[in-house]
Design a protein with these regions (language model features):
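Membrane-interfacial entry segments at the cytosolic side of transmembrane helices
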Residues: 124-135, 218, 255-268
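Alpha-helical transmembrane segments of multi-pass inner-membrane proteins
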Residues: 129-155, 168-234, 241-252
Length: 446
């Protein structure tokens, strides 16, 4: 099947399309962490101008604000409020508060900015799919270079960009590294343009969902192949689970109105109740093997979670500590609450921050679940949300939002689309066909 030709048609589509295509170029100069916030806030400003009616073309004005977008803005605003409250509570100083607020604009703030852009700007989801799949092709072509660099024992990292001076979570966000070596077992791992290997697999999983919904068979297989290659080379355990899981869950969640799906679900639920004990045993066995696959990493993650939970409960249950703190030597001084969005939120922003992510995620899943019964874009967006939800248990979403922002744009596009009720549509078609039959019968009798 020939690939449908897709070209950007609006300034917003051009910016999104070419920002994705130039990902590797931005990575080479260490600007990837800077580009996403700049592009995001600029496009958000353009969308705001269009919404208030200052666009030069009346037909280009934005529609009403979807309720889901309001939920995301209010929730991310609550994140900022918790951050400020924690700084005041622990007397961390104005300088630290300003620095953390800028960090919010480059992290959690983007979780509201990019859905807003998707919902309020003239951007087609297909443009995002195709740009991401073209980036996947670039990545596949670069894989031999990355492997060759490891075989040739080139320095790692090659260099750290001087753009690090603008500030960020750490030097890994500005370094150019062709490969890395796992300190726990000596294995080679590749992080591609992400700061670390599991983050690369996370972005690959989001790209997989885009590939599944690209109408071109060629680009579809390019995207799928890239996801598998990146997931394997990154050695991410969660990615290898998420790939089949998202495909299976999408097949179920997007067909809930079909009698066959409901019947199979009833049968499986009954069998699950009758076989609860063997299933739990299998789950326990799988969990043990999953943790043993990289035992040192699992141990560090468990200790980090324990420290974060204990200090949250005993020191700052409402608004958290306000800032990230390094852990003790037993966890190799990794930040407390890292490797897990929920524990990280509890430690840094307390129960307020925890709820500020849980509420919009839950609303988004429910809204897209309804729309996905008949809307193709909503199905893709639901897949993205499923992947994001998976990775809240293995990554810190805040510091990776600059990488998975195309998924947030597609979520926004899906939110602006109207809810379509397939059952009601079928009923209306039956009514229309019945009325047409009555008219034909009446005409023949005349």
């Amino acid at each position: 099947m020939a690939a449908p030709i897709l070209h950007p048609e609006t300034p917003e589509e051009n910016i999104v399309y070419y920002t994705i295509l130039w990902t590797w170029g931005f990575w080479v100069i260490g600007a990837l962490y800077i580009v996403a916030p700049v592009v995001g806030w600029y496009l958000a400003y353009r969308a705001l101008l269009r919404y208030v009616g200052q666009s030069s073309s009346a037909c280009m004005r934005a529609p009403r604000i979807p309720f889901g977008i309001i939920v995301w803005w209010v929730s991310m605003g609550a994140m900022l409020f918790a951050l400020v409250a924690a700084h005041i509570s622990f007397d961390l100083g104005l300088g630290s508060m300003l620095k953390s607020s800028i960090g919010w604009a480059k992290g959690w703030g983007l979780m509201a900015v990019f859905p807003w852009i998707g919902a309020m700007s003239p951007i087609r989801a297909e443009i995002v799919y195709r740009a991401t799949n073209k980036l996947a092709l670039q990545t596949l072509l670069l894989v031999p270079i990355f492997i060759g660099a490891a075989l040739a024992h080139l320095p790692h990292p090659l260099y750290v960009s001087p753009l690090q001076i603008v500030g960020g979570p750490g030097p890994e966000f500005f370094r150019v590294e062709l490969y890395s070596i796992d300190e726990t077992n000596g294995n080679l791992r590749w992080s591609f343009f992400a700061p670390w290997s599991p983050a690369a697999a996370f972005i690959a999983n989001v790209s997989l969902v885009f590939a599944l919904y690209d109408r071109s068979r060629f680009w579809k297989w390019i995207g799928v192949a890239c996801c598998v290659v990146v997931s394997v080379l990154s050695q991410s355990r969660l990615a290898l689970i998420a790939i089949p899981a998202v495909v299976l869950l999408l097949a179920i969640f997007c067909n809930l109105t079909r009698p066959l799906t409901l019947g199979l679900a009833s049968i499986l639920a009954t069998l699950g109740l009758l076989s609860a004990s063997p299933i739990m045993s299998l789950v326990d066995t799988f969990t043990q093997r999953f943790n043993q696959a990289r035992a040192a990493s699992s141990r560090v993650r468990a200790v980090l979670r324990s420290i974060a939970l204990h200090r949250w409960e005993s020191e700052a249950p409402i608004f958290g500590h306000g800032v990230v703190e390094k852990g003790p030597h037993i966890v190799e001084h990794m930040p407390i609450g890292s490797h897990h969005s929920w524990y990280g939120l509890l430690f840094v922003k307390g129960i307020v921050g925890f709820a500020a992510l849980a509420v919009p995620l839950a609303w988004t899943i429910l809204e897209l679940l309804v729309k996905a019964q008949a809307d193709r874009v909503a199905r893709c967006a639901l897949g993205v949300v499923i992947i994001i939800t998976f990775y809240t248990f293995g990554e810190n979403l805040e510091i990776l939002s600059y990488l998975f922002w195309p998924g947030l744009v597609v979520i926004g596009i899906a939110m602006r689309r109207r809810v379509f009720n397939p059952l009601r549509c079928r009923f209306e078609r039956l009514q229309a066909s019945g009325a047409e039959g009555t008219q034909l019968a009446h005409g023949s009798s005349i």
